[in-house]
Amino acid sequence: MEKGLLIVISGPSGTGKGTVCKELLRNNNFWFSVSSTTRDPREGEIQGKSYYFMSKEEFEDKIKENDFLEYAKVYGNYYGTPKSKVIEMLDKGKDVILEIDIQGALQVKENYKEGIFIFILPPSMEELKNRIIKRGTETEESLMTRFKSAYKEINYVSKYNYAVVNDKVHDAVEKIQSIISAEKCRVDRIKDSILLSKEGIIHEQLYD
């Protein structure tokens, strides 16, 4: 069985990567990896669906037990991707989406180079500011921290395979779907199945 694709989507806070991922999942048979975090839940977030919310002590115990594919500390809180389920789904041939921060994505890229790494960009920095402000969940101090981090994080776009500007969610989703479709046709991903098919054809011609 062919392994599934690991699709890693990240970008600065406010680029709308969460919304993009929701739309991708709505129209495709992807498996979405739910991250663990020590931050407090936001309004409407559900334990086990939005995140696995846990204490700092619980998270650090899981780090010691090597339970994470990647983890990072962002704005004072831990975020991490539980490892075992991701590996299980990939081995079953399921395409897996990780929506993770930039630190975490670069960790995954070190250990899983065959993944597809997609960086979500805002249409402009002004629009990025507006999106973060509209959330209404940040203090003035934390807003400034997020703005400064976003400016720095955009410099990491060159570490990714693809960059997608999220101006309109529908357009961004279509671009990502096109990227995934193209990746599935890459010869280095499908050469084994091509060779098996070729051997089958030769066998038929020789013995039938």
Swiss-Prot record:
GO terms for cellular component: cytosol. It catalyses: GMP + ATP = GDP + ADP. InterPro entries: GK/Ca_channel_bsu, Guanylate_kin-like_dom, Guanylate_kinase, Guanylate_kinase_CS, P-loop_NTPase. It holds the Pfam family Guanylate_kin. ATP binds at residues 11-18. Residues 4-181 form the Guanylate kinase-like domain. It comes from the Bacteria. It is found in: Cytoplasm. Its EC number is 2.7.4.8. The keyword NAD does not apply. Keywords: ATP-binding, Cytoplasm, Kinase, Nucleotide-binding, Transferase. GO terms for molecular function: ATP binding; guanylate kinase activity. Essential for recycling GMP and indirectly, cGMP. PANTHER family: GUANYLATE KINASE, GUANYLATE KINASE-RELATED. Belongs to the guanylate kinase family. This is Guanylate kinase. It comes from Clostridium tetani (strain Massachusetts / E88).
